[in-house]
Amino acid sequence: MLSDIIPQGFKDDVHHTLTEHNFKNTIINYFQSNGFFLVKTPLLEYSNKDTGINTFKIISKKNEKKLNIRDDITMQVARLSQTRLSKKTMPFKLCYYGEVVRKRGTMLRPERQFLQIGAECIGENSFLADVEILELAYKSLSLVGIKDITLEISSRVFLDRFFTKIKSSPKKDEIKRLIRLKDLASILDILETKYHKFLKDIFSCTGSYKNKKNNLKKLKVDDLTSKEVENINTIMSKFLKRNSKINIFLDLSEIDKKYYHSGLRFTFFSKNIRGEIAQGGRYLVRKDDKKLIATGFTCYMDSLLRASSTKISHKKILVPFNISKKNLQLFIKKGYSILRYTGEKNINKKLARNQKCQFYLENNKIKKT
């Protein structure tokens, strides 16, 4: 069968294409109206040390450089800021969209090809850049009909501090595995007693941000962790003043799935929708042997389509082939999708219904089917 040529995780899409196109335009237009410059990166790149384990690699000859199909656009945009845009004035505000491909799907996201949309602010140290990106993400999701949004806040700073403490432990990998499972009791059974308090304090910061923010004080064990606690509270305070209705969940025991995040990171979820609908955070970009701070977010169209309550449809109308240009332009201006009839019969309700039209033009009058 012809359908057998499509691998698992890929598909022909004939039902959601119109909605996807409208959502993408809505989000990108919103980015641009907020001063983000639209860029485009290639689907293929040469392999390098940053190539992920879930990257789709293209088989090549021994004497040829290995090629990858991109599985994430964020780092491509970061590279672009170091090359083509390196002479431009900082900070850069860039946005993008494009297809990405994964070697393997997951239980929460079995799709292996999907449209990625995102925005990045590169070279801005102020916490206000984080607030702007959070608001940009939240508003973008709202614009395409996503409701009951929950924002999860995390940071790798605290677990990194913990892993540094136990770096010589032979059970470090097992401890990481148990942290991913949120199995604190089993971790404490194999962890040296002197490290118990700090790890328990990290886990105590899991829950509603409003209820758990006071627990963050316990994590101020050095300059870096103290600075990060203040950073989280400052960003959240500013964000909540302007977006008071959103639910915010705190989880500092979450191990970062993205290797490049350097501090604060965030994930958006929607009620009754599997998996995240958007994610982002702080990361570092190298420029002229210096490290620049960047922040951004990305969302995936497959998740947006599942989460959105908005239904996009054209007002489709069946009209005679020889309709005047004036009337044709008038119908287009009014938002109709025009289907010109090339048959010999007179246009009627039955014909229009057969063509999946909601309207038809009969004797110069618009009628509903």
Residue ranges and their predicted role:
Residues 47-48, 157-158, 179, 347-348:
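Short secondary-structure capping/turn micro-motifs that flank functional sites
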Residues 86-90:
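Phosphate/dinucleotide-binding and metal-coordinating scaffold of catalytic cores
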Residues 19-34, 45-46, 74-85, 96-146, ...:
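Positively charged, Gly/Ser-enriched RNA/tRNA-binding surfaces
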Residues 153-166, 183:
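Short, conserved secondary-structure transition motifs
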Residues 38-41, 94-96, 150-154, 249-251:
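A structural signal for short, well-ordered beta-strand segments and their strand-loop junctions
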Residues 1-75, 131:
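TRNA-binding/sensing appendages of the translation machinery
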Residues 56-62, 167-192:
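Acidic, His- and aromatic-enriched active-site or binding-groove loops in soluble protein domains
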